[in-house]
C-alpha cells in the first residue's frame, strides 16, 4: 500500500446532535432500570430553547422525561442563557407512542432463543491493531481531543470554554502503518471575552499537547484552532440537533463500512445497535487473538427471524489463517441471534447514556470491548 492520508472527526458532548443522542439514551437507561424487557425507540430534536422527545416505547415503567432531559442538558453544561441554551428554562415537549404490534409479534417468542430481529438490516464491526484499544487511530485521537476539551472546561482549567466543540485528525500512513499526524483541527465554543491568540495558545497547551503523542508530530504538522476566528454562538442556538446524525463519529470514523443504522435511543432488541456491538466484539477478539491485523465483520438480519441471514469476515489480506476458517470460528464461538448476543454481552442494563458521546467503541469498560474469547479462538485456530 502506498503512502496515504486518512482523516476522522469527533464532536463533543455539547454538540447539538450529541445532546440529542444523550437525551435519547438517558431515557432508554431510565426505562431499562425499571423494565429490562422494554421496547424503546426514542428520538430527540433540540433547537434554541426547545427539546422534543418522540418515538415508540412499550414498557411497564414510568419515567419523567422532562426531568431526565433537563438533567442531561445540565450535566453537559448548558446552564446559562448566555450559552444560547439553558437546562432550567428550555421547553421540553414529548410525543411518545407505542411500538407497532405488527413489529412486536415478529420479535417476541415463547422460546427466547427464537426471538426475532426487530428489523431487517446490515451491521458492521471492525478492529485493528494500530492502537492499544484495537481501534483506528484517527477516530481514537479525535475522540480524546474533545474529551479533553470537556475535562478542562468542567474542571475550571479553561473556564471560558463552552460545551460545543469539534475535532478532526489526519494521520499519515506508509504501507498501512502510521508514520505521523499531518493535520489537527479543533474548534471550540467559547465565551465572548477571550481573544483569538489567547484561545489558540491555551487550546494547544491544555488540550492538544497532552493528548497527541509527540512521536507522531513534526515540524510539518498543521494545526487549525478555531480557524474561523470566532465561535461564540454554538450548541442548539447555532444548529439544531437530532438523534442518530453522527453515526460515523459513533463508530470507526470512516475507516470501516457502516450499515446505516444509528444506535442511541434503541433498546437491545434493535439489531441496528446490539448486532453492531456484537460485530465489534467478534472483530476485536479476532484481532486480539492474533488471527488478523485488521478485521471487519458484516452481519445481516430479516425482521422477525432469529438466525442472521449472512455473516462475512473481511481481513484485508492480514489474516494468519484462511478466511474460510475464520468464518467457521465466528459461527462456532459467537451466538449472533438477537437473544444470543443480548445474553452474550449482557445488554439488558442501563449502560447506554455513556456511549452517546465520544464513541461507542474503544472504551474498555463496555461489555462488547472484552477480549475474553481471544485465547479460545487462537487455540481453535491452531496457533501457538
From Swiss-Prot:
Necessary cofactors: Mg(2+); K(+)
The protein's enzyme class: transferase
Annotated metabolic or biological route of this protein: Amino-acid biosynthesis; S-adenosyl-L-methionine biosynthesis; S-adenosyl-L-methionine from L-methionine: step 1/1
Subcellular location: Cytoplasm
E.C. code: 2.5.1.6
Keyword Protease: no
UniProt keyword Cell wall biogenesis/degradation present: no
Cofactor, how bound (note): Binds 2 divalent ions per subunit. Binds 1 potassium ion per subunit.
Ranges for region Flexible loop: 99-109
Domain of life of the source: Bacteria
Binding site for Mg(2+): 17
Positions of L-methionine binding: 56, 99, 239, 270
GO biological process, one term: S-adenosylmethionine biosynthetic process
Record-level GO cellular component terms: cytoplasm
Molecular function per GO: ATP binding; magnesium ion binding; methionine adenosyltransferase activity
Positions of ATP binding: 15, 164-166, 230-231, 239, 245-246, 262, 266
Keyword terms of this UniProt record: ATP-binding, Cytoplasm, Magnesium, Metal-binding, Nucleotide-binding, One-carbon metabolism, Potassium, Transferase
Catalysed conversion reaction: L-methionine + ATP + H2O = S-adenosyl-L-methionine + phosphate + diphosphate
Record-linked NCBIfam families: metK
UniProt cross-references to HAMAP family, sorted A to Z: S_AdoMet_synth1
Annotated family: Belongs to the AdoMet synthase family.
Protein name listed in UniProt: S-adenosylmethionine synthase
The species this protein was found in: Klebsiella pneumoniae subsp. pneumoniae (strain ATCC 700721 / MGH 78578)
Lineage: Bacteria, Pseudomonadati, Pseudomonadota, Gammaproteobacteria, Enterobacterales
Gene label: metK
